[in-house]
Structure formats: C-alpha cells, structure tokens
Design a protein with these regions (language model features):
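A short, proline-enriched helix->beta-strand linker immediately N-terminal to the Walker B motif
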Residues: 59-63
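Helical segment within the ABC ATPase nucleotide-binding domain
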Residues: 79-92
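A short, surface-exposed alpha-helical micro-motif characterized by mixed small hydrophobic
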Residues: 106-108
Length: 148
C-alpha cells in the first residue's frame, strides 16, 4: 500500500523519497489505514482499496479531484467510509467533481449540483435550487429515489 501511494510522487514528480513516505503515512492515517501501510491491495476490503486510491491521488497534491461513482462497486455497508472521506475533503475545501447517484450525500456536501439527462444539462444550481426544481425530469428522478 505505501509503495502504491508513493510511486508516482517519487517517479513522476521527482520528489524526495523520505518526504513522500512521511506524507503517505499521514495520508494513510487520515484515511484510517495507518495499520495497512505494509499490506497488499488484495488484502484490503473494497472500501479500504478505495481509500488507498484517494490517498494515492492526494499524494500528488492535486488542485482538484474527480470521482466517478466512488461508491458504486462497494458493499452498501462500506459506502459510508468513502462518503465520510469525501465529506472531510470537502470540509478542507478540496475542489471535487463527483459523479454520483448518492443524492442525499450530494445535497449535503455539494455547493453546486448539475443534473444531466440524456447527456445534456437539465438543471444546475445550489443543492436547494436543484432539489426544489420544478423541472419535470428532475422531479421524476427524485420521485424514484428516497431523498429526504
């Protein structure tokens, strides 16, 4: 796991190995995985693997993160782990673009939501504007979900 996180910053960004390893350890602690530094990815749960991938991305010090359905392949019981990590990143003002069907999560974390229908932006705005939109397709979509 630690090598998985440190490889790109060392090889691509040519950063100092010691600095990168220290940062990776901090990222693993932040992800709740400090005890997994020497584990192999196959020894981790899906949620743990996803958190390692987020740590790997953060190790590159990006200005923005992109997530495409970050919880879709996870056991429902592990979804909360990933949503908490993303929520914590939002609280730290990390800019993120997240494609998700986790509508309650989007409502609570996003400062802007874009709802797309058939590849076209149908509704965009603040969570309040989007979730109270009178747009027919938006209402139909929300009606099929249990959004509080």
């Amino acid at each position: 796991v630690i090598k998985n996180i440190t490889d790109a910053p060392i090889r691509v960004q040519k950063r100092e190995k010691e600095e990168v390893y220290e940062e990776a350890k901090k990222l693993l602690t932040k992800m709740g995985l400090a005890d997994k530094a020497d584990a192999y990815p196959y020894q981790l749960s899906g949620g743990q693997q996803q958190r390692v991938s987020i740590a790997r991305a953060l190790a590159m010090k990006p200005k923005m993160l992109f997530f495409d359905e970050p919880t879709s392949a996870l056991d429902p019981e592990l979804t909360g782990e990933i949503l908490k990590v993303i929520k914590d990143l939002a609280a730290e003002h990390m800019t993120m673009v997240i494609v998700t069907h986790e509508m309650n999560f989007a409502r609570n974390v996003a400062d802007k939501i874009i709802f797309m229908d058939k590849g076209v932006i149908a509704v965009e705005g603040t969570p309040e504007e989007v979730f109270t939109s009178e747009h027919g397709r938006m209402q139909e979509f929300l009606g099929k979900l249990s959004v509080e």
